Amino acid sequence: MKIPDLKSVILGKPKEQINNDSTESLVPVKSISDGIIQLNNGKYVTVLEVLPLNFYLKSELEQKNIISGFAAWLKISPSRLQIVAQTRPADIDAFCERLEDYYNSEANENCRRMIFEDAQLVNYIAQNQAVTRRFYIVLPYEGGSAEMSAICDEMSDTVNTARQYLEACGLETVTHTNEDIFLYELLCGFLRPSLKGIKPTQIPEDIRDALSPDSADMTHRDYTVTEGEYRSYLYLSAGGYPSSAGLAWAAPFAEAGGGITAVFYLERKSREQIIPKIGNAAVFNRSRIQEVGDTRSDYEQLDDAIESALFMKSQINREGEDFYYINTLMSVSADNLDDLKRREKETVNLCGSMGFTARRADYMQDKAFLSLLPLLEIDRDIAHKSRRNILT
């Protein structure tokens, strides 16, 4: 009798490197039209781009107004949202080409040397400091119609409402000349890193083929390689959040540096659905704590759980706050494995310095790859490991 390999039994057989003929499995997109993405599972989403805002330069009153305005929108927004904060090294190609033209046309040797030194400085800053930040909110279609016209009308209303509330609290949204091309270019940034800097002029007829990476290696435990770009995926564990956080607690994730993408999944639960669960949990933990000695370690855990339940119930009933589940995922990208590991360590340390516990999605990198796409689709296993309840 042949004895099976224990590693294969526990972890499964090694995944094969995905080549150009099979990478369509990484593209859950069926079509893009009318500013809407249709997914393979029949769902529809759209993406709203929001311009960056330096929150720290605002006065205390302005900061509170921004937070309260955003919270007001969350009360009437779709019950499920995805917020994407993407940072990339600044694109300096056009500027460098202009400097090169100046350099070639300059006759004075001293001026040529100054232009060359400027080019070196710009290149250094771009590699080490300069980044571009882009923010997106992914909105779902929550209606029940199968008619595309009705879907478009409802999605348009959802986007317009979001624009109205966000701009009322000081956040400027972007209206693109062609929303379909914007969505296609956005997805290319996640699925086709080799096309970075190439501006599409139209939507390809076969959208899945156009979005399919030329190569994708998902065989590694702790990273992936897509068209030569190395990526590692992290998540904040469910118990890895501090008990309380101040204003703009998530801002450092968006400022972590080039090659870092932070994704936040939000799911609102109705009061009618969540209040009974919170009450039952408090009653259950109260009955358990009576059987536990106050010197045992789990006594403190039960006492904290009871206090948290009572606090949430009070805030929901008396302060009008909403109950949400949040999942925080991050991807780290680099041109080589050494830089990837360095950036990954820096990101984990950043999270730890703020009281968060970041874990790498080992043996789930392929699932994390799909969960980071701006399509409001998170893997069930990753969602379970990273889900945390919060209040607005």
Identify the function of each model-found stretch.
Residues 2-392:
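Extended, folded cores of ATP/NTP-driven motor/assembly subunits in large transport
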